[in-house]
Amino acid sequence: MELVIKDVPSLLSVSEIIFGRDFNEALIHQVVVAYSASTRQGTRAQKSRADVSGSGRKPWRQKGTGRARAGSFRSPIWRSGGVTFASKPQSHSQKINKKMYRGALKSIFSELIRQKRLIIFEKFSLDLPKTNLLVKKLKEIKLNNVLILTKEIENNLFLASRNLYSVDVKDVCSMDPVSLIAFEHIIITVAALKKVEEMLS
């Protein structure tokens, strides 16, 4: 299949097997959920009755006081006692094998091409790391909510985009399924697209 290059009047030939896949919503959903779960810190922690500091002595004898029986100062029903079902640090990561991950990326790129959300440039860079230069460049092509993918990180582009909420710059090795779905348009250079094709083949 052939794709149009925006800044140069020519076509780029790419693999139909990689960029002509059907939209597999279930697979993409599974991969996106797994990716999002793996970014969770999972470091929250609370103290159970075993972790709270305090005496292990029985507060008062079992019978004869007229008060409700009590066995510990650290009981969850007492003030300053432990939490009943205390949270502990845990990993939320889910296993996704390489074949599934690559399949999801192929499906996402194929859908981006079908929806004309993938815009290819021969070269996309800035002479200076200035935010207003990037804003002006994006206004010229009438785009605002954009992920810019390059073969290797363009320092000027990266620095210019840091203050823009709706623009992100990544190199191909750092791309992820969540970012590819989240942005309205993806700007990608020819070199980056060839690298994506090589990675997914």
Swiss-Prot record:
Function of the protein: One of the primary rRNA binding proteins, this protein initially binds near the 5'-end of the 23S rRNA. It is important during the early stages of 50S assembly. It makes multiple contacts with different domains of the 23S rRNA in the assembled 50S subunit and ribosome.
GO CC terms of this entry: ribonucleoprotein complex; ribosome
Domain of life from the UniProt record: Bacteria
Name of the coding gene: rplD
Designated name of the protein: Large ribosomal subunit protein uL4
Alphabetical GO biological process terms: translation
Subunit relationships: Part of the 50S ribosomal subunit.
Family named by the database record: Belongs to the universal ribosomal protein uL4 family.
UniProt keyword list: Ribonucleoprotein, Ribosomal protein, RNA-binding, rRNA-binding
Region Disordered: start-end pairs: 44-68
Molecular function as annotated in GO: rRNA binding; structural constituent of ribosome
InterPro entries referenced in this protein's UniProt entry, alphabetically: Ribosomal_uL4, Ribosomal_uL4-like, Ribosomal_uL4_dom_sf
